[in-house]
A protein has these predicted regions:
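Conserved beta-strand hairpin/beta-sheet module of binuclear metal-dependent hydrolase folds
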Residues: 1-62
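Active-site metal-binding motif and surrounding structural segment of the metallo-beta-lactamase
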Residues: 46-47, 51-104
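Cofactor-binding loop segments of dinucleotide-utilizing enzymes, especially the Rossmann-like FAD-
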Residues: 8, 105-107
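Conserved small/polar residues in nucleotide/adenosyl-binding loops
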Residues: 119-122
Length: 122
């Protein structure tokens, strides 16, 4: 089993827009961090933990072509804000459509469903 850290930044990522602290103004590339997320790999299975706004870039950067499931730790936007980008994985091998299971607490999944239904009404 392998754990890949996809992001370890704050809810806004690092650097934070407009911040002038030493970390946010640092030239050290280690101080540039995407929002928190990780991926577990074992055998041929990939489980992503949280899909925040940086999800698309995190997947492109790691060269991932498929995921099997997503675990959402809670309903804050920095953990669910990239779910729309998950759709691309459903159609990687079109016309075969891949199902991706999403796990979370009842409250988290309720919030995701509500968020998705509100987007469709706009």
């Amino acid at each position: 089993m392998k754990l890949i850290i996809l992001g370890s930044g704050t809810s806004q990522g690092v650097p934070v827009i407009g911040c002038r602290c030493a970390v946010c103004t640092s030239k050290d590339p280690r101080d540039n961090r995407l929002r928190t997320s990780a991926m577990l790999e074992w055998d041929d299975i990939r489980l992503v933990i949280d899909a925040g706004p940086d999800f698309r870039y995190q997947m492109l950067r790691t060269g991932v072509r498929h995921i099997d499931a997503i675990l959402l730790t809670h309903e804050h936007k920095d953990h669910i804000g990239g779910l729309d980008d998950v759709r691309a994985f459903n159609f990687v091998d079109y016309p075969t459509i891949h199902r991706i299971d999403v796990f979370g607490t009842r409250q988290t999944l309720k919030c995701v469903r509500k968020d998705r239904s509100e987007e469709r009404r706009v």
